[in-house]
UniProtKB/Swiss-Prot annotation:
Residue ranges occupied by any Gnk2-homologous domain in the UniProt entry: 33-136, 142-253
Gene3D superfamilies assigned to the protein according to its UniProt record, in alphabetical order: Gnk2 domain, C-X8-C-X2-C motif (3.30.430.20)
Signal sequence annotation: 1-26
Keywords: Repeat, Secreted, Signal
Protein's name in the database: Cysteine-rich repeat secretory protein 41
Ranges annotated as spanning the membrane: none
Keyword Repeat in annotation: yes
Organism whose genome encodes this protein: Arabidopsis thaliana (Mouse-ear cress)
Localization per Swiss-Prot or TrEMBL: Secreted
Keyword Signal found: yes
Cellular component aspect of the GO annotation: extracellular region
Amino acid sequence: MSSVFGSVHILAMIAIQLLLTHSVSSLNLTNAYLHHKCSNTQGKYKQGSAFEKNLNLVLSTITSIGNFRDGFRYTEEGEDPNNVFVMFQCRGDSYWSKCPPCISTAVSGLRRRCPRNKGAIIWYDQCLLKISSVASFNKIDYENDFYLSNPNNMSDRGLFNKETSALLEKLAYKASDRNNLDGKQLVLYAAGEKRIGTKKVYAMVQCTKDLIFTKCFECLEGILRKFPQCCDGKRGGRVFGTSCNFRYELYPFLRNYSNSTMRAPY
């Protein structure tokens, strides 16, 4: 199946992982760019068009009054054929004050990398932003994904693969549990850690909050099947989709691993 956002040169993305620092504090503060895709099929809008005006309105709105408590927003503006749909999702430990800087950076980055594209996605370390002329609420995006992995291998690859996959699967069940709530809202996020031999693995999974819990699990189940291609024996790895993602490392990269949902203390 061909992707509407073009082919992904996955191996080229591995180098990006090497550029990211392993410092917990710096990871928490950075909005490191990871990847982007510009739509090849949705076309481009003209300067001064109704689509551009709708897009500008939505983007200015989400950066000023976005739902930063929950780290997510899906909104639309305009009428067909000038409908604009915009979604952002911040990483599960990057809500509240940590979310706005990443979204602002993503808006600027998307405008620069995909100028006048009606459809585009951009991923940063702590958030993703998607614009489209096509509605996608509660629909799993199976087309647009990529992965990053550490080039170094574990010595006991078989055991490491088995135990890391088991941890990620456990987190997928937790994230998509209908009882995993923040108030009345599904969390759709989980993080945890596990000792494997002499090493400790830190991991997280997350879905965008437009999905219902069953679709969240379906999405995570799908990207976890990509573990062999992405992460076979690797000391760290991530698979990113538009609708869900997972990550594991041999160092802590989140602020907290004790709770499925992590809030800033203010």
